[in-house]
From Swiss-Prot:
Solcar repeats lie at residues 184-270, 278-363, 375-463. Belongs to the mitochondrial carrier (TC 2.A.29) family. It comes from Danio rerio. The keyword Transport applies. This is Calcium-binding mitochondrial carrier protein SCaMC-2-B.
Length: 469
């Protein structure tokens, strides 16, 4: 019969001591754990408390807020199985040992780049016999009761496109761990992200409509400022007009997210990657192709959004009426005006956003990720805001040309220009600055959009039963 395992915390000024008492009938593979006397410096006590909270949450089967001996043993066995899977994924040579090169390669596959010196430092923290390699026993003994996070949890903490919605649809999809896919948590993340996007876009819709108006109507001779633009919209259609075109902008979130995710997973299989996570280049290629497929599928909704945003009060009775007017007057091809610059804008936006975000993520992980891969709210928001801003800045001229091409037929007397012709016309008549009309309201909405989508996403995760970070 198994007796109860006790640990007694003793607070001392310089260290905190934990005594583990061994049970005679404890399973062999767990005995060594209870022969330990751990001496933790006082500054590491917070790490211990975080680890204890995490263990109780993972192993508490009867949900009584406590971990009895049977639950603790079950947790250790289950955790050891997970550690075995992670060890095998790191052991690229299948020789039963992990060296510094394998650690560097595994993190590189995830998008985390470290030097050989840093990899050796990681090895030394686990290497007991000085061989500069880690076998299974060393790996298990170090991680079984250690508060550090494993590699898949970096994916969990650093989700990007799922969490942040700034109104653009060109981000590379997030990676999901095998556990998230097997348990069905992936679709809950997508639903939470979609709901967050709907709230975020609705809250920032006035700025988005102002951006469209400035992209199409603002010129060197017809300057339109932010205050003037808002005044003009309210005078023409009242406060309600500030949200004109927002309905279709929200409706397109669900089909676009679903198509992009399914396409991304299929493209990953087609390029022959069996890894749980892709490298940066593979992610960019797969994500850009998935984005192109999703955008092609819902592009008519993009045209409708632009036309509704530019429409006068009473011009259209709704989305269906707008679509009917466009089809009757201009034909089916009108629903794909501006398609080429839209597709061309995916690569610079997605590429720069991903590169900046991964660079910031790697920098934080290398400098500050000592006990946890969790960056906290402020770091996540800062990284998401900076990467989205850089991506938008790079692709903005293409976005402006796309919007003007979508709007051409709705402007009486406006010549129907090609993409290259419109570029030349803007530069000749307005200068290079003309390619950045509407940039100010576009940037103004980034911080509130990122903040709102994050808060709503976290709350929807709780509602949907997604494991909290």
């Amino acid at each position: 019969m198994l007796c109860l395992c006790l640990y007694v915390p003793v607070h001392i000024s310089e260290r905190t001591e934990f005594e583990y008492f061994e049970s005679e009938s404890l399973p062999v593979q767990l005995k060594s754990l209870f022969k330990l006397s751990l001496f933790l410096p006082s500054q590491e006590f917070d790490s211990y408390r975080k680890w204890r909270k995490k263990v109780v949450k993972a192993g508490d089967k009867d949900l009584d807020g406590q971990l009895d001996f049977e639950e603790f043993v079950h947790y250790l066995r289950d955790h050891e199985k997970k550690l075995r899977l992670v060890f095998k994924s790191l052991d690229k040579k299948n020789d039963g040992h992990i060296d510094s090169q394998e650690i560097m390669q595994s993190l590189r596959d995830l998008g985390v780049h470290i030097s050989e010196e840093q990899a050796e430092k990681i090895l030394k923290s686990m290497d007991k016999n000085g061989t500069m390699t880690i076998d299974w026993n060393e790996w298990r003994d170090y991680h079984l009761l250690h508060p550090a996070e494993n590699i898949p949890e970096i994916i969990l903490y650093w989700k990007h496109s799922t969490i942040f919605d700034v109104g653009e649809s060109m981000l590379v999809p997030d990676e999901f761990t095998a556990e998230e896919k097997n348990t069905g948590m992936w679709w809950r993340h997508l639903v939470a992200g979609g709901g967050a996007g709907a709230v975020s876009r609705t809250c920032t819709a006035p700025l988005d409509r102002l951006k469209v108006l400035m992209q199409v109507h603002a010129t060197r001779s017809n300057s339109m400022g932010i205050a003037g633009g808002f005044t003009q919209m309210i005078r023409e259609g009242g406060l309600r007009s500030l949200w004109r075109g927002n309905g279709i902008n929200v409706l397109k979130i669900a089909p676009e997210s679903a198509i992009k995710f399914m396409a991304y997973e299929q493209i990953k299989r087609l390029i022959g990657s069996n890894q749980e996570t892709l490298g940066i280049l593979e992610r960019l290629v797969s994500g850009s192709l998935a984005g192109a497929i999703a955008q092609s599928s819902i592009y008519p909704m993009e045209v409708l959004k632009t036309r509704l945003a530019l429409g006068r009060t009473g011009q259209y009775s709704g989305i269906a009426d707008c679509a009917k007017h466009i089809f009757k007057k201009e034909g089916m091809t009108a629903f794909y005006k501006g398609y080429i610059p839209n597709m061309l804008g995916i690569i610079p936006y997605a590429g720069i956003d991903l590169a900046v975000y991964e660079t910031l993520k790697n920098s934080w992980l290398q400098r500050f990720a000592t006990d946890s891969a969790d960056p906290g709210v402020f770091v996540l928001l800062a990284c998401g805001t900076m990467s989205s801003t850089c991506g938008q800045l790079a692709s903005y001229p293409l976005a402006l040309v796309r919007t003007r091409m979508q709007a051409q037929a709705s402007q009486e007397g406006s010549p129907q220009m090609t993409m290259s012709g419109l570029f030349r016309h803007i530069v000749r008549t307005e200068g290079a600055i003309g390619l950045y009309r509407g940039l100010a309201p576009n940037f103004m909405k980034v911080i509130p959009a990122v903040s709102i989508s994050y808060v709503v996403y976290e709350n929807l995760k709780i509602t949907l039963g997604v494991q909290s970070r």
